[in-house]
Amino acid sequence: MTEHKSGFVSIIGRPNVGKSTFVNRVIGHKIAIMSDKAQTTRNKIQGVMTRDDAQIIFIDTPGIHKPKHKLGDYMMKVAKNTLSEIDAIMFMVNANEEIGRGDEYIIEMLKNVKTPVFLVLNKIDLVHPDELMPKIEEYQSYMDFTEIVPISALDGLNVDHFIDVLKTYLPEGPKYYPDDQISDHPEQFVVGEIIREKILHLTSEEIPHAIGVNVDRMVKESEDRVHIEATIYVERDSQKGIVIGKGGKKLKEVGKRARRDIEMLLGSKVYLELWVKVQRDWRNKVNFIRQIGYVEDQD
């Protein structure tokens, strides 16, 4: 009889390499926020993948970048601390991009860890097969990886194979979470992330990092209806105008798209109320960062 495997796996990589897409693919639900804007993941999102023979808890770390404010410092601290807590590390890179300074910075960091490190080349659907092997050899010249696996998280190509390879390196152990649990974050947190994702999709480049979402109230009013009130925080009046849009059109569209995903998450009808408030320079206010849910790990 095959022993049951269980373990914690950290996904690390530069912004926009597809970490959140991968987590959502293997879990089968939208847990991690997805956007083409950089630095959209702010907390360690734990997605729980349960199979008959294994349970893997994926920790989706914030993309590595040079911090520009207190929130950035926090995101980097989360990423680095994660490396010391887990059973395996997925270093995810874009197969269709050159190795950059950010990749080299991460590799230097990974050389000092004793945990197995898997190089996962994502977005192979965008690369000609002849270009893949030279890219793999280039990465191999930097360090010895435990395994190297090319995938496409978006299409699901080679993802199951990677999971099979990963499982062989995980320790034998019990299930840490019930079969039907897909995240260790409360539903309120995931709801806030869904709202933030819709804003990122609908707003311009100046907005993304200045957006914070706090779910103020979430009440089940009846068997099939949940009432949610949430506040969207921006740093400037001009940003507030962009999020609301002409005649409230943009905010209405954010609500419409968010409600659809939240209803799928909760399995019930949702009445969603959204407000937009200005909190100047909030990304440098530690107490406010904690208040809206980006909380430091307790020792």
Swiss-Prot record:
Keyword annotations: Cell membrane, Cytoplasm, GTP-binding, Membrane, Nucleotide-binding, Ribosome biogenesis, RNA-binding, rRNA-binding
Cellular component terms per the entry's GO annotation: cytosol; plasma membrane
Molecular function in Gene Ontology: GTP binding; GTPase activity; ribosomal small subunit binding; small ribosomal subunit rRNA binding
Subcellular location as annotated: Cytoplasm; Cell membrane
Segments of this protein annotated with the region G1: 13-20
Topology of the protein relative to the lipid bilayer: Peripheral membrane protein
Region spans: G2: 39-43
Protein name: GTPase Era
Annotated source species: Staphylococcus aureus (strain bovine RF122 / ET3-1)
